[in-house]
């Protein structure tokens, strides 16, 4: 396992992370909420490795992280209006959107949805840009256990099974993202988390065409 400290902003470290993930490796990355197992979204073998690491017995889909709005076209055929995303992204808000049918099964929910977030952390968005495609992310823990927020504990528990660990220090007080279902009418709060969202405003902005009175 390669371990990279993120205290410095060396471009070499970012390049090494990007190269590993781009080649199909499994990484652990600090996000603006929690540490996450990550891999490129279009590499089913790497995603399956992560599912095995977590010991997942369910089929709940993994989260996808993007670095800009343009990446939505790779994940959903029905991207929300740009105005609806203002004030929400970038930030700790996960949106459930209608998934493209060609996404791997581990990224699609049973109802045909995909969970997407544009994180606020600039190093993370720079990494996603360097990789060139969205990445999947899921908390660093085995199913039913508490997510790990200390890189030393992560290295001890999973170091032999991952390719690279980006060490951003202990993420004290990390809180999971807020989840909003934009496929519901009106948009619905699925999980309260690190951000508050004005659902009434959001409903006005994403209201389907022809629904105006």
Cite the ranges covered by each PLM segment.
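Active-site-adjacent structural elements in enzyme catalytic cores
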Residues: 1-213
């Amino acid at each position: 396992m390669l371990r990279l400290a993120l205290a410095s902003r060396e471009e070499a470290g970012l390049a090494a992370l990007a190269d590993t993930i781009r080649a199909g490796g499994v990484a652990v990355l600090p996000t603006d909420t929690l540490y996450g197992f990550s891999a490129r979204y279009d590499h089913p073998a790497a995603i399956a490795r992560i599912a095995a690491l977590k010991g997942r017995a369910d089929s709940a889909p993994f989260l996808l992280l993007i670095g800009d709005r343009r990446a939505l076209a790779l994940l959903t055929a029905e991207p929300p209006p740009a105005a609806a995303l203002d004030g929400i992204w970038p930030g700790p808000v996960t949106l459930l959107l209608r998934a493209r049918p060609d996404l791997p099964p581990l990224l699609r929910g049973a109802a045909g949805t995909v969970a997407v977030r544009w994180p606020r952390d600039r190093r993370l968005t720079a990494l996603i840009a360097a990789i060139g495609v969205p990445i999947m992310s899921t908390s660093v823990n085995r199913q039913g256990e508490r997510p790990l927020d200390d890189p030393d504990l992560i290295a001890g528990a999973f170091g032999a099974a991952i390719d690279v660990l980006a060490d951003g220090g202990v993420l004290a007080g990390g809180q999971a993202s807020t989840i909003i279902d934009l496929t519901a009418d009106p948009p619905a709060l699925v999980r309260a988390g690190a951000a508050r969202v004005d659902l009434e405003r959001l409903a006005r902005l994403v209201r389907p065409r022809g629904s105006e009175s």
